[in-house]
Amino acid sequence: DNWVDNCNGRLVVPGLGAYRMDKSEADWAVNDITDQIDYSRYYGGAGCAFFRCGNVLYNDKGLYKELRDNYYKYPAQLPPLTWLNDSVPAAPEGIKVERLDDELHLTWEKPVSEKQDLTYTVYYSLTDSIDTASAKSILATNIYGNELFLPIDVESERGYTFSVTASTRYRIESEP
């Protein structure tokens, strides 16, 4: 049976044993881990957890580089916990972009109607429309404040479109 088919609306996040890549453990190759990621994605897993972090970051077989370059290129939001609460928060208000010397300063206001703590995700695009369903559009996520500073290269400055969403502690995201 597929665990995802029997998860009762909960998230399935397989734990992958990156420590098994050590010669003293099982001497796995990088593809032993990436095959498990592919399998989890194919069956609808909500992501992967790696045990132990040091085995990912300092692995001499190149696991970190493989994950960074081919599996986790873009920032990602954590999946929503809809079984705990599915209330959609109001969208941030008063989004402004100002240029301050060699930085862009994005600011927004917490919606007046929201009493709970929120985190924010900033999306961007080089066109007038933003695909918020694509991780490629996420500039930053899990922001706790209401501002973001972005360094810019004055010589290659381009026009960007920005959008900001709010998320609850259950990771339910507002509309942009």
Give the residues covered by each predicted segment:
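Short beta-strand segments within Ig-like beta-sandwich modules, predominantly Fibronectin type-III
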Residues: 138-145
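Conserved aromatic anchor
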Residues: 102-115
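Beta-strand-rich modules
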Residues: 151-174
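Short strand-edge motifs at loop-to-beta-strand transitions and within beta-strands
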Residues: 146-150
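Proline-enriched interdomain boundary motifs that mark the N-terminal boundary
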Residues: 87-96
